[in-house]
């Protein structure tokens, strides 16, 4: 639904998935839209799996917090970055790189988890565990893969520093309010999430435009 909503709003030619992994999220994107699809990841094995899908080009980058993306300036129409920034020591470095490779007026679709909506805070209070939605059930605090915990405001601030303006908040796709979320109409989910993303969404999903 997130990709469909994005493509309903913008036109794309070159699409780049930063942190594409095995391609599970964007590997079939060319069935939805006519584009040139680039995948970038730090895991060589994952890239081997992604190579079985519809990517036109796959690129290996060792470290997203210090390595320049081997992509030309102002050459990409849309960058997708899902579940990556929360793993990085310096996520601003990557968002700056994404801004560099995007064309003027290009778009950035980004998603990060929100560990602490209302339900997450209650779980933390009861269990004293930062993994509020069991993303990594085998991890402990000393090796927990998520090292950055974002709010809507902190995401907007970081995007602003990288030269972006948020044009759509699609976090309502990740509305979470215990068992009741199944019975809440989409319009109400959207309203609650826009009013208070941090309280009602399990993930922060934003579409931003390069200024």
What are these regions (language model features)?
Residues 81-82:
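A short beta-strand submotif of the Rossmann-like class I SAM-dependent methyltransferase core
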Residues 13, 56, 77:
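Conserved acidic residues
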Residues 68-78:
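A short acidic, Gly/Pro-enriched loop at the edge of an enzyme's catalytic core
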Residues 12-19:
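Conserved class I S-adenosyl-L-methionine
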Residues 14, 36, 165:
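Residues at the starts of beta-strands that form the adenosine-phosphate
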Residues 24, 28-67:
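Class I SAM-dependent methyltransferase SAM/SAH-binding core
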Residues 24, 42-45, 49, 89-97, ...:
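S-adenosyl-L-methionine-dependent methyltransferase catalytic module, highlighting the catalytic core
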Residues 1-12:
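Conserved alpha-helix/loop element of class I SAM-dependent methyltransferases that forms part
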């Amino acid at each position: 639904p997130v990709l469909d909503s994005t493509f309903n709003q913008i036109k794309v030619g070159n699409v780049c998935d930063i942190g594409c992994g095995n391609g599970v999220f964007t590997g079939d994107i060319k069935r939805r839209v006519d584009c040139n699809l680039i995948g970038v990841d730090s895991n060589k094995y994952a890239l081997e799996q992604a190579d079985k899908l519809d990517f036109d080009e796959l690129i290996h980058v060792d470290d997203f917090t210090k390595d320049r993306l081997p992509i030309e300036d102002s050459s990409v129409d849309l960058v997708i970055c899902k579940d990556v920034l929360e793993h990085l020591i310096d996520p601003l470095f990557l968002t700056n790189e994404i801004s560099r490779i995007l064309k003027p007026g290009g778009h950035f679709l980004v998603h990060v988890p929100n560990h602490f909506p209302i339900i997450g805070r209650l779980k933390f209070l009861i269990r004293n565990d930062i993994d509020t939605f069991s993303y990594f059930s085998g991890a402990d605090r000393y090796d927990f893969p998520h090292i950055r915990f974002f709010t809507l405001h902190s995401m907007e601030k970081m995007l602003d520093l990288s030269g972006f303006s948020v044009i759509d908040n699609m976090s309502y796709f990740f509305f979470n309010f215990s068992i009741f979320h199944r019975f809440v109409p989409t319009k109400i989910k959207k309203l609650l999430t826009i009013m208070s993303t941090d309280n009602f969404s399990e993930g922060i999903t934003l579409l931003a435009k390069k200024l």
